[in-house]
């Protein structure tokens, strides 16, 4: 649910809107389900894509940790000896190779499990779910210009670029909810996790 008005139960830094995510924690029946979906994007699917080599953990959205700055990173490279600056830059992520390949259709998977348990005067319910999706986007021949003021009715360019932008976005989500209840009491244990990773490459031509 999206709330646009402030109320007492919302955080103090409420600005503009507040999103409340309500997850189910009562299993209606014992069941297991698996779903698969795919989709096509005009101008992207089956077209040529270019991205960095990356790391295996990029496939589940956790590649950022492999690209973190080394320990003892200087606050300003300009104030250290040139050789020290050169040595430091060699420690930064070295995976700059570029792969060129054909974009496959977007892939989406989800798995869910619901189960109920009877415990004398209590009932125990579990809902678990995992979902995963990955997809590509390609934006070709995008104009990316910066202008000065007009002169004689013509645009004066500071920069005039043509960009090709390629992206791969991966989303991983998980849900693990437990509910223990009786006629008079209820105990809930809710877990909700989301991870999103984006790899992008911009190919730019111009001046």
Predicted regions and their residues:
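Short secondary-structure boundary/capping segments
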Residues: 16-18, 49-53, 143-147, 204-206
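Transmembrane beta-barrel wall of Gram-negative outer-membrane proteins
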Residues: 84-202
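Flexible glycine-rich, low-complexity coil/linker segments exposed to the extracellular/periplasmic environment
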Residues: 44-98, 102
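Short helix/loop capping segments that flank catalytic or ligand/cofactor-binding pockets
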Residues: 10-11, 42-45, 122, 136-139
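Conserved nucleotide-binding/hydrolysis micro-motifs of P-loop NTPases
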Residues: 26, 39-41, 196
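Surface-exposed loop/turn segments flanking beta-strands in extracellular/periplasmic regions
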Residues: 54-65, 145-158, 207
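A beta-strand signature from Gram-negative outer-membrane beta-barrel systems
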Residues: 1-34
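Short, solvent-exposed aromatic-acidic interface loops
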Residues: 36-41, 131-133
């Amino acid at each position: 649910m999206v709330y646009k008005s402030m109320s007492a139960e919302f955080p103090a830094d409420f600005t503009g809107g507040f999103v409340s995510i309500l997850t189910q924690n009562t299993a209606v029946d014992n069941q297991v389900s698996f779903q698969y979906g795919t989709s096509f994007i005009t101008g992207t699917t089956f077209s040529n894509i270019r991205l960095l080599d990356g790391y295996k953990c990029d496939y589940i959205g956790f590649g950022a940790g492999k690209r973190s700055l080394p320990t003892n990173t200087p606050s300003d490279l300009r104030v250290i000896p040139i050789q020290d600056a050169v040595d430091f830059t060699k420690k930064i992520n070295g995976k700059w190779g570029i792969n060129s390949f054909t974009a496959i259709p977007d892939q989406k998977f989800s798995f869910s499990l619901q189960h109920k348990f009877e415990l004398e005067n209590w009932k125990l319910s579990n809902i678990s779910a995992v979902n995963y999706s990955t997809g590509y986007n390609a934006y070709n021949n995008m104009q990316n210009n910066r202008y000065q003021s007009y002169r004689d009715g013509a645009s004066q360019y500071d920069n005039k670029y043509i960009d090709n932008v390629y992206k791969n976005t991966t989303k991983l989500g998980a849900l693990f909810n437990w509910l223990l209840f009786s006629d008079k009491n209820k105990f809930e244990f809710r877990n909700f996790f989301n991870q999103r990773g984006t790899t992008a490459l911009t190919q730019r031509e111009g001046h």
